[in-house]
Amino acid sequence: MISDINALKYKKVLLKVSGEALMGDKQFGHEYEVIKKIAGDIKEVIDLGVEVAIVVGGGNIYRGINAALVGMDRASADYIGMLATVINALTLQNVMESLNIYTRVLSAIPMMSVCEPYIRRKAKRHMEKKRVVIFAGGTGNPFCTTDSAAVLRAIEMNCDILLKATQVDGVYDSDPKKNPDAKKYFTISYKDVITNNLQVMDTAAIAVARENKLPIRVFSIKEQGNFARVIQDKGEYTTIEE
């Protein structure tokens, strides 16, 4: 462990956690042992002195784009997906607080009875007080992914880097689960991600990150302690930058 925060390159980070990461090997919902492991990884990073914000997806409960494909109005489907992210955020908050991690959930869709509305200044203040802020509700707008929300919130919070936790250990030129010969990139430019149509994030999210010079690091959440390792430039990952 690094006890001196000044020795760390990244002092304020945003972690993007997909809904799928929260369900483990299940087909739907939550796997609490997996969530507890993720919470433990987050605590390890907090103990380094790093300020942490989180954006959660909702794909383990509902995927708006899939519902739209079978005939549901896309905007309505996306709003339902945003509600799914709030469920995930509250679940993650509960598990994190069981580990004595001070946590606040801020939703882009106001739900005063269950969490705070997203206000940028309030979110920044929570982070300054070393609370973990979990952003829910996506951007609050339909037709926008939670990846776009992650990029926007990282920029708004002045984060040093966005870390995307996935099921694989980086960005590949094709799906490594389907193609055993898939080539892994250790670093790749925003332009090449867009040009090669790599499905690590949607094009809009990558474009906004590029415009604001926000580096993105993609790593596997499956291995215990990976979050802390990646923060310290260790382990397996891919960095997306200019």
UniProtKB/Swiss-Prot annotation:
Localization of this protein: Cytoplasm
Family (UniProt): Belongs to the UMP kinase family.
Listed pathway(s): Pyrimidine metabolism; CTP biosynthesis via de novo pathway; UDP from UMP (UMPK route): step 1/1
Entry keyword set: ATP-binding, Cytoplasm, Kinase, Nucleotide-binding, Pyrimidine biosynthesis, Transferase
GO cellular component, one term: cytosol
UniProt note on regulation of activity: Inhibited by UTP.
Protein name: Uridylate kinase
GO biological process, one term: UDP biosynthetic process
One protein family per Pfam: AA_kinase
Organism: Rickettsia felis (strain ATCC VR-1525 / URRWXCal2)
Amino-acid positions noted as binding UMP in the UniProt annotation, renumbered to this chain: G58, D78, T139, G140, N141, P142, F143, C144, T145, T146
SUPFAM superfamilies in the cross-refs: Carbamate kinase-like (SSF53633)
The enzyme's E.C. designation: 2.7.4.22
First-level EC class: transferase
Quaternary structure and interacting proteins, as annotated: Homohexamer.
Catalytic reaction annotation: UMP + ATP = UDP + ADP
Any coiled-coil regions, as ranges: none
GO MF annotations in UniProt: ATP binding; UMP kinase activity
UniProt: ATP binding residues: K16, V17, S18, G19, G59, R63, T166, Q167, Y172, D175
Gene field: pyrH
Transmembrane segments: none
Listed InterPro entries: AceGlu_kinase-like_sf (IPR036393), Asp/Glu/Uridylate_kinase (IPR001048), Uridylate_kinase (IPR011817), Uridylate_kinase_bac (IPR015963)
CDD domains with a match to the protein in the record: AAK_UMPK-PyrH-Ec
HAMAP family: PyrH_B
Function: Catalyzes the reversible phosphorylation of UMP to UDP.
